[in-house]
Amino acid sequence: MEDFMKNALKEKLNQGKSVFGTFIMTSGLDTAEILSYTGVDCIMIDGEHGSMSLETAGRMVSLIKNTKTTPLLRVPSNEISLVKRGLDTGTAGLMIPMINTKEDAERAVQYCKYPPMGVRGMGAGRAVLFGAPADEIKDYYAKANDEVLIIVQIEHYLAVENIDEILSVPGIDIAFVGPMDMSTSMGLTGQLNHPDVQNNCRKVIESCRKNNVVP
């Protein structure tokens, strides 16, 4: 179970190394498997905008875990049931969209962490090898709070206004900027090179550096 729980992506990030990843939005299992052999560090399974079901996403997680690539999953929204079920796929990290306030961030972390740090429920899903053997389940519960990456998505001008408060929440590992939604929230849809959009992106990066969060 030790190797099963080890998060190679988080280890690289903690060492200050750059990582390279990609998104998958289609439901083809072969596509996910092929991508995992291309040398990327991680694959983000897009459960927000992608066409795959949660069942298919779970199968993708399993396929990717059989390679040197780390599987990640983006859930549709910051809701406890979606976060819990997403984590039960066994993903090494979860991206949660539209985190606009400190309270949003606190809820996201709470949903991702087991007690006493959070409210994640203990189920016998893929993450714990479907409940057997008991010693390994205990090991997963003990390590998951530290090993599973929590990625908050910053994609609205309100999030930028609150960025220092958001990233001060303990437990956040990565802040991922969504520039298209950011530009739309500012009334500048698609103008990703507009100075105001670029300035907001810079503010997020600066706050990440202050709060020891990976941008």
Protein language model features and the residues they cover:
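Catalytic beta/alpha-barrel core
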Residues: F23-I24, I43-S53, P71-P76, G93-N100, ...
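Short, glycine/acidic-enriched loop or turn micro-motifs at the edges of active sites
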Residues: H49, L158, D181
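Alpha-helix-loop-beta-strand connector modules within alpha/beta enzyme cores
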Residues: L54-D88, C112-M117, A142-N145, L192-P215
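N-terminal amphipathic alpha-helix/helix-capping segment at the start of soluble metabolic enzymes
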Residues: M1-G21, A134-D146, R202-K210
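Non-catalytic positions within long, well-ordered alpha-helices that form the structural scaffold/packing
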Residues: S36-Y37, L87, L167-S168
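Conserved N-terminal beta1-alpha1 strand-loop-helix module at the mouth
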Residues: M1-P71, S77-N78, Q110, I150, ...
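Conserved anion-binding
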Residues: S81, G93-P170
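Histidine/lysine/aspartate-rich catalytic loop segments that bind and position anionic ligands
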Residues: V169-H194
